[in-house]
Amino acid sequence: MNAHPKEIWEQCLNIIKGETTEVSFNTWIKSITPISIENDTFMLTVPNDLTKGILSNKYTDLIIRSLQMVTSQKYNVKFLISSELPEEFLTLDTINEQNIKGSIIVSDEMSAMLNPKYTFTSFVIGNSNRFAHAASLAVAESPAKAYNPLFIYGGVGLGKTHLMHAIGHHILHNNTSCKVVYVSSEKFTNELINSIKDDKNVEFRSKYRNIDVLLIDDIQFIAGKERTQEEFFHTFNALYEANKQIILSSDRPPKEIPTLEDRLRSRFEWGLIADIQPPDFETRMAILKKKADVEKLNIPNEVMAYIATKIKSNIRELEGALIRIVAFSSLTNKEISVDLAIEALKDIISSGQSKQVTIELIQDVVSNYYNLKVSDFKSSRRTRNVAFPRQIAMYLCRKLTDMSLPKIGEEFGGRDHTTVIHAYEKISNNLKKDESLKNAVNDLTKRLDQQ
């Protein structure tokens, strides 16, 4: 079959998509980029070691089979990490198995501005950040055609910078000749000051106005700096009028940034404003599991659940706690457990700040204990693997909280208070004769006491 590797791969994707889950396809398969055909080997690039390992172990046979269906030829496949590509792949584009010289311009300066770990592939999507992620991806796919400017805001450590870098990586991946500049507002200000001091205003303006994409992190810090705001106002106008993409991040929406000039505030609101909220329990667990996978750490599920229930508002602190526990385990030569996690994190999680047991907390702990989602408790599912843990959770809510029966029922998908009574009585009676249930309830109660 005489076709470009990218054309072949596009057809393969249609086959592979039908044989994988949506999550697997979006997470692993879509991260692959075909680069060439060398003899009987189809060369594919992937973003990192983790992706390479997963694809090699789980999806090689499926990819080979899809290639054979599309081309009627049997190819081997080879995965290469994009950041470690041999030099020839940066200058060669193989078509119909013939090497044809091409010219791919990759700016080392632009790439150096971006953290290689901050990509869309490594970003964990949850309800708290889904909108901001979708907006960022739309901008990365079609710069200056989707939302301009894109303004992302949220608290410290929630993923704003990750999305900013991911946008930059994605744009450069799709168009290596694109001029992308990522900078913090502090650096922008310092460069402006130096340009004034050294009489290099022309060079400064050229750097920031003759580009295709400008990403400025923590834009709120230009507020109150008159000269910086003046310069950025004209930079913004120059880029916007030239149909260039602008992406800004802040810890608050434009209308809440004090001492920000109204003319800038209005421009920041021209495009799309997307917020990132603190992650919910499921997202916190997903973040920890992804971190453990990337770092190749073997962390018990209950330990990650402990971290996720204790640290709620900051992803960096969440990941930092995981690494702290691993380091503590290594230094003390103890196995990783919930008890070890409590000891390792006692300095950053005050025992005096133990929070009140709530219905939400009980749902989080019990659902995790039984490898379910909180949404399962609120669903209409009645299979034993869901119904029985739901009854245990209702029992604990009745026993450990002051909530009324109707309120408990409401929090479990709008169930009637009689359902809660039935669950409480059933678990109470079974506890008298079922030793394994007694152990489970005691374990759950202990975990809740440790919150």
Curated annotation (Swiss-Prot):
Which residue stretches belong to region Domain III, AAA+ region? 113-329
On assembly, the entry states:
Oligomerizes as a right-handed, spiral filament on DNA at oriC.
Database matches in HAMAP family: DnaA_bact
Asked whether the keyword Cytoplasm is assigned, the reply is yes
Q: Where is this region: Domain IV, binds dsDNA?
A: 330-451
Query: Is the keyword Electron transport assigned to this protein?
Result: no
Of which family is this protein a member? Belongs to the DnaA family.
Written domain comment of the UniProt record: Domain I is involved in oligomerization and binding regulators, domain II is flexibile and of varying length in different bacteria, domain III forms the AAA+ region, while domain IV binds dsDNA.
InterPro entries (UniProt xref): AAA+_ATPase (IPR003593), Chromosome_initiator_DnaA (IPR001957), Chromosome_initiator_DnaA-like (IPR020591), Chromosome_initiator_DnaA_CS (IPR018312), DnaA_C (IPR013159), DnaA_dom (IPR013317), DnaA_N_dom (IPR024633), DnaA_N_sf (IPR038454)
GO molecular-function terms, A-Z: ATP binding; ATP hydrolysis activity; DNA replication origin binding; lipid binding
* Stretches of the chain forming a coiled coil according to its record: none
Annotated disulfide bonds: none
Q: Which gene is the coding source of this polypeptide chain?
A: dnaA
Family matches, as Pfam families = Bac_DnaA, Bac_DnaA_C, DnaA_N
Its function, per the record, reads: Plays an essential role in the initiation and regulation of chromosomal replication. ATP-DnaA binds to the origin of replication (oriC) to initiate formation of the DNA replication initiation complex once per cell cycle. Binds the DnaA box (a 9 base pair repeat at the origin) and separates the double-stranded (ds)DNA. Forms a right-handed helical filament on oriC DNA; dsDNA binds to the exterior of the filament while single-stranded (ss)DNA is stabiized in the filament's interior.
Keywords, sorted A to Z: ATP-binding, Cytoplasm, DNA replication, DNA-binding, Lipid-binding, Nucleotide-binding
Q: Where in the cell is it found?
A: Cytoplasm
Task: List the Gene3D superfamilies hit by this protein, alphabetically.
Answer: 1.10.1750.10, 1.10.8.60, 3.30.300.180, P-loop containing nucleotide triphosphate hydrolases (3.40.50.300)
Name under which the protein is recorded: Chromosomal replication initiator protein DnaA
Binding positions (ATP): G157, G159, K160, T161
Q: Which residues does the annotated region (Domain II) include?
A: 73-112
- Per the UniProt entry, what is one GO biological process? regulation of DNA replication
Q: Where is this region: Domain I, interacts with DnaA modulators?
A: 1-73
Cellular component per GO, a single term: plasma membrane
Give the principal location in a single coarse category: cytoplasm
